[in-house]
Amino acid sequence: MEIIKFEKIDSTQIFAKNLKTPEPWTVILAKEQTAGRGEGRDFWYSPKGGLYFSVILPKSKIEDLQTLTILAAFIVAKVIKENFNLEPFIKLPNDIYLNGKKIAGIITENVIGKEVKFSAMGIGLNTNIDSFPKDLENMATSLNMKLGKEVDNEKILKEIIEELKEQLKTIGE
């Protein structure tokens, strides 16, 4: 798996969608995003400390992007639960909450030419963020805020990607 790393980027999802012929499972990872994206026109607050990445998905038998997004939401929730003994809630199709506050969001988009060239999935997970702006503090949380300690972003990334690979392989069989 190739990982393209950035200290700061506008959006990992925009970068991923502009790749010409990316290999499946290429990951675009940023420590900070200046224009992180959510569903529709939503903005994803992406300061240093969070886990922000997009992954190029292989062609799959799942053609419905919403199904892929829901699958990823369950995987992210599972990783949170298994690693940190927390009880995330999934607001279908693409948001994950802890105690009523958003902790993660997922967006999946196709890049289309004459046909679908590839799909890019973006995941924003609030990990090592210790505070949010006033307009978000009642709506957003982070693993750091819930646990009182920093978490290993690389370990979480690896677990999410490995689980995605496993689930998509199983579906493809």
For the regions a language model picked out, list residue spans one by one.
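N-terminal lobe of the biotin/lipoate ligase/transferase fold
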Residues: 1-82, 86, 150-151
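Active-site proximal loop and beta-alpha junction motif in alpha/beta enzyme cores
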Residues: 3, 27, 92, 113, ...
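Long, positively charged amphipathic alpha-helical accessory segments at protein N-termini or as interdomain linkers
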Residues: 20, 60-63, 67-88, 98-173
